[in-house]
């Protein structure tokens, strides 16, 4: 295993989804789309708040109409059996976030109309003197369904209470354009990503959107076209299809003002700097990108799962193993936020207990279809020739086993699992520090910041009893402040901030085009705040009833459609059915 190992770019593999999708768009069709959107851009930028609210309502109702069919096709494409708990994944990673985001955007637009401000919670401070803004729970139903969960944004240095208010919802208060066309290059793994990116660009930033579907899940495009049909009819949105060639044509198109991509850093660099070779190197040295347009991006991560040593009971460690398993197993581990590196304390008995619990949970989950192009190739390159590899589950044709790689040396400079996103069902562990919580946190933060690739997200597990010690409590808060990740989940599933939609989702700020890491810019952010450094979700160490997103929940496929329906208007009448299924999970 050496530094010379390079994993191929995702787009270099042919996509062959199990569900039929529309054919690639021709250049004339793409030209027609961009021309139409160019005509609609100024109109959209000048819409009144009332007109935007009407459009949001139409888009949300449209998405509710297609949700079930969208989930069914997603399950078919990924080899998931309908009517089983695994079906819940497609509800959780598809309609839930989209319907919720549209509700929260509507609430923000109504608040802007009525008060001139978007809704936020209490403003506080962080241990390093920055402002923090509470965003979740946003209402009593949030608080009841996710008891003692909180989400806040930590602002960048220099953001003041005055600038926090002045810069909020900037497009609506201080418009910086009179109509722009943005190209959104959709992700191929998670159904919600493309529509949620579209919603962000349209309603946070006031831009019209050309959405190019990813070939891996292009079968979802017709559902997005149907759901967001009103935006398409008014020339505010167009959906096109194709692979790298079509994407390249649109990226440099004269009618595209800017680009947003969810994908890999390799794809980003090909767009910004051109194909690998001497010419790219020269451009990078001269800081002369091939792409002259603004680009924002979310580009993946080697996601750490950090466990602070403490007085955990067996059931408490088991609950956190469920969190880790959910992050690792969901969507067959084809997620940018999937747990990939267990960063555990040296010389602490709980490290082995956690790994055993995690492996026991994974062993009961049948291996999933490796639907993402290149998965088997990546898996073989990362696992072949290693000594401490454990495969779990009976592998069927087309699937890959849940794979654990143990005992990685944290000081190994050429370990590919530290420096490259695997994007396949591989998880590894490494040990740092000691059983002393403060020493461990210092070492773990240093390792994650300076050894692991990426700046998107991190999990931090800490026992509440430890926080009663002022010294340890301070060390935990300093660790949260120092971790250079855009999203941090404390004692919670890392995918929750994504689907909650109110927090920002994106890389830690400060990347450069030459070293993009996990990307630049943020999406979601339904309160439309500026100057965000990171989103922080905190949860209890254990929760009851069992969260519906846990891989072991027995009725999640019954509960998730009800949760999606509730998110339409956040009505109490729709809560009892959710609670009933949650309690029986």
Regions found by a protein language model. Give the residues of each.
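N-terminal Rossmann-like NAD(P)+-binding subdomain of aldehyde/semialdehyde dehydrogenases
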Residues: 2-167, 213-218, 227-232, 576, ...
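Catalytic cores of nucleotide-enabled group-transfer and carboxylate-activating enzymes in metabolic
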Residues: 47, 54, 66, 81, ...
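C-terminal core of ALDH-fold dehydrogenases
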Residues: 54, 441-550
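Active-site-adjacent "gating/activation" loops or surface patches in catalytic cores
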Residues: 148-192, 196, 205
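PLP-dependent aminotransferase-like
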Residues: 181, 193-245
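Conserved NAD(P)+-binding/catalytic subdomain of aldehyde/semialdehyde dehydrogenases
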Residues: 181, 215, 230-341, 346, ...
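Short loop-to-beta-strand entry elements in the cores of soluble alpha/beta enzymes
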Residues: 205-216, 291-310, 324, 328-356, ...
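NAD(P)-dependent aldehyde/semialdehyde dehydrogenase
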Residues: 330, 346-456, 470-471
